[in-house]
Amino acid sequence: MKFTSVIALVATAATLVGAVPFETNAERLARGLPPLPPARRASGVEAAKPKPSPSHGCSTGPVQCCNDLVDRSNHTVGILIGLLGIVLGPVTGLFGLGCSPLLGGGAKCQSQTVCCSDNKFSGIINIGCSPINIGL
C-alpha cells in the first residue's frame, strides 16, 4: 500500500513538473526577478576547433577542388604556362584549373577532387594532379 502511494505521488509530481510552462527572461524581469543564466549548448573551445579533413592519402598538400582537370595538350594550359612564365620539365599527371583547397570536415566539392604535386599558382593552375575520390 505504501509503495503504491509513493509511486502515485512520484507520478503526480512528475506530471506537474512537466506541465509547468517555460518562463522567459522577459516574464521574469517583468515580475522583478533576475534573468536566468544562458543555456550552454556547446563549449566555445570545442566549436572553435578546426575539423580535420578526412583521410585521403594526399601527401603533397591539401586536397584541391578544381573546376577543370585537363592534360598538357589543352590550349588553355599552354596559354597559362606562357603567361605565368612556368618552365615545365616532365610532368606526371594532369593540370587542375581554377582550384581551391578543401578545408574542414564538412567541405564539399562540386567539381573534381584532386591531389596535385605543385600548388604554387594560387589555384589558377595546379600541376601534376591526380583525381581522387574522398567520398564527399
UniProtKB/Swiss-Prot annotation:
What is seen without this gene? Increases the sensitivity to sodium dodecyl sulfate (SDS, a cell membrane degrader), hydrogen peroxide (H(2)O(2), an oxidative stressor), calcofluor white (CFW, a chitin synthesis inhibitor) and micafungin (MF, a beta-glucan synthesis inhibitor). Leads to sparser aerial and reduces the cell wall thickness by 40%. Does not affect the chitin and glucan amounts, nor the cell wall synthesis-related gene expression levels. Also, does not affect the hydrophobicity of the aerial mycelia.
Indicate where this protein resides in the cell.
Answer: Secreted; Secreted, Cell wall
GO CC annotation terms, alphabetical: extracellular region; fungal-type cell wall; membrane
Q: Mostly located where?
A: secreted
Q: Which GO terms describe its molecular function?
A: structural constituent of cell wall
Instruction: Enumerate the CDD domains for this protein.
Output: hydrophobin_I
**Pfam families hit by this protein:** Hydrophobin
Task: State the signal peptide span.
Answer: 1-19
Q: Which residues are glycosylated?
A: N74
Q: Which residues form a coiled coil?
A: none
User: What keywords appear on the UniProt entry?
Assistant: Cell wall, Disulfide bond, Glycoprotein, Secreted, Signal
**Paired cysteines (S-S):** C58-C115, C65-C109, C66-C99, C116-C129
Subunit structure of this chain's protein: Self-assembles to form functional amyloid fibrils called rodlets. Self-assembly into fibrillar rodlets occurs spontaneously at hydrophobic:hydrophilic interfaces and the rodlets further associate laterally to form amphipathic monolayers.
Q: What's this chain's function?
A: Aerial growth, conidiation, and dispersal of filamentous fungi in the environment rely upon a capability of their secreting small amphipathic proteins called hydrophobins (HPBs) with low sequence identity. Class I can self-assemble into an outermost layer of rodlet bundles on aerial cell surfaces, conferring cellular hydrophobicity that supports fungal growth, development and dispersal; whereas Class II form highly ordered films at water-air interfaces through intermolecular interactions but contribute nothing to the rodlet structure.
What is the similarity comment for this entry?
Belongs to the fungal hydrophobin family.
Q: What is this protein called?
A: Class I hydrophobin 16
Q: Which organism is this entry from?
A: Pleurotus ostreatus (strain PC15)
List the top taxonomic levels of the source: Eukaryota, Fungi, Dikarya, Basidiomycota, Agaricomycotina
